[in-house]
Each structure stands twice: as structure tokens, then as C-alpha cells.
Amino acid sequence: QILTETELLPGILQQNRYLNFICKNVFVKIKNKENVYFNNIKKNILELHIAHNEGNYFCSHDQLKSLKDNNQIAVTYCNKEGLEIEETNPNGALENIAGIFNKNKNILGMMPHPERMIDKYLSSDDGSYFFKNILESFR
């Protein structure tokens, strides 16, 4: 949230569509792998966790066009098969957007919490791919 409020990332995070706190597992589709966050992750769909009251991403039409033109949409909410449908959008985020990059793709803001999904005992270790990938980029 601080990334949008300080304008390091475009748009805003609004209160969730149904005005409630959401805490659950979701699936996200990786939309851009040309960055240090996702470039070596083999999977295209990750199971991650969300826990927020204000996670409803919104931006202007011009900002959305710019995000698309510059390939800045990082991840979107989807189902297990990767379909980005309304039913998979937990908070009402514009076009199922779960995370975006800045233009240089060195700043990532996303609603899902990969740190909460780093062990199979937590139902998924998909979050570990995210952190392992970042570590690999520094080697």
C-alpha cells in the first residue's frame, strides 16, 4: 500500500469490494517473467495467501493502458487452471490485478503474501519459489 501512496507504483488500493477483511489462499498467474522476481520460476500459476482489508487495486484508464503497454502487470488472480474470471477476484481488483511493477520492473507491489506459503505444511510452498528466485538473481 505504501508503494502506491508514495507513487512509486501507479494506482491506489481501495477497501475490498464487500468491505470485509479477507484471509485465504488464492491462485495467481504470473504475467511477466522478465524480472528478478519471477524470471526463473518454472510454474505459471502460484498458490499464495492474502490477508487484507484494502487490497482492491484501482487505477485510471490511462494508468491501466500504460501498465499494459509497458508489461507492468506482474500477477493476476486466477483459478487453479489459470483462468482469470470474476469468481477468482477476491477483492474486486481492477482486471483481477494482484501485483504490478514500476516501469523499470525493479519495484514490485503485490497483495498476496509469498512469505506465508513457503512450506508444504502451510498447504503450499509456492511462495518459496519467489524468494529462491530473488536470491538466485544476486549470485
Where are these regions (language model features)?
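Cysteine-nucleophile active-site neighborhood
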Residues: 1-35
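C-terminal and late-domain segments of enzyme folds
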Residues: 38-139
